[in-house]
């Protein structure tokens, strides 16, 4: 997380969640999101132009915006930010100058999911594993989607939080059964090193399905993760078994991460896969498999609750929370 310059009095915040295809923007006013719009990145040569068009669409003056926080896909450092899946580049100095900003904050897109977890209401969460969260302990955020995002949220007291981004999606994929090992061998033949992300992602779900079909002598009927999910929902036994295995592997990876960071404050699942198949996920063996391990580690995990985040725009909310905390810290 990086910020620049000082806050001016009485300004209005703008937040963005920028992906490879779309950029979502909103105003941040009174610690709430307003005027959410989705724009196509391909329609704008530079992100500054997208911001200007967004403000024009909602009838807001650029002059009223003094603070911006953008969630960006990829590691955020001090240098200019180059998006990996679109043509945009953010030059910090040029961005601030063109929009007349006092404050610019860039954060990793998955970090905003962690920020959002500090603010979500009960109607934006579905509890999938019962437990008792310890308010003074870390929370774990994990999300299989295009990749496997992992991060943690640390309470600092006084309503303040610290987000610790990491590369937890690239830990080794755990193998605990003969079927795990057979699938792992198929992944290793394709990729060499088998990280958790190789299985717990959109591409991973498809790879698990293809390998599973080969192991069982079943014809492949899907060419995308979405098709695997659709087959499972339609009652296809092979696809359903793969989706179940996906959820069980997610349970073990999430449980391992809780053990590593001491996330007794609970686990928050996000990403594009689990919320899409929420009913099937709730019916899966995830909750039991999460703590099914050795005596000591199983006891440690036994009372850790798990939620699925169902908020419509958690990236924007998280960007707003990150911006608010940065501004409050400046006084």
Curated annotation (Swiss-Prot):
EC primary class: transferase
Subcellular location: Cytoplasm
GO molecular function per UniProt: ATP binding; D-glucose binding; glucokinase activity
Keywords linked to the UniProt accession: ATP-binding, Cytoplasm, Glycolysis, Kinase, Nucleotide-binding, Transferase
GO CC annotation terms, alphabetical: cytosol
InterPro entries with a match to the protein in the record: ATPase_NBD, Bacterial_glucokinase, Glucokinase
Family, as annotated: Belongs to the bacterial glucokinase family.
Name by which UniProt lists this protein: Glucokinase
Organism, as annotated: Pseudomonas aeruginosa (strain UCBPP-PA14)
Gene: glk
